[in-house]
Amino acid sequence: ARVPFYRYYK
């Protein structure tokens, strides 16, 4: 499962 806040992970 991918991280839910992947967009803000960067």
Swiss-Prot record:
Keywords from the UniProt entry: Cell wall, Secreted
Native source species: Pinus halepensis (Aleppo pine)
Protein name from the UniProt record: Unknown protein 6
Keyword Secreted: yes
Subcellular location: Secreted, Cell wall
GO cellular component terms attached to this protein's record: extracellular region
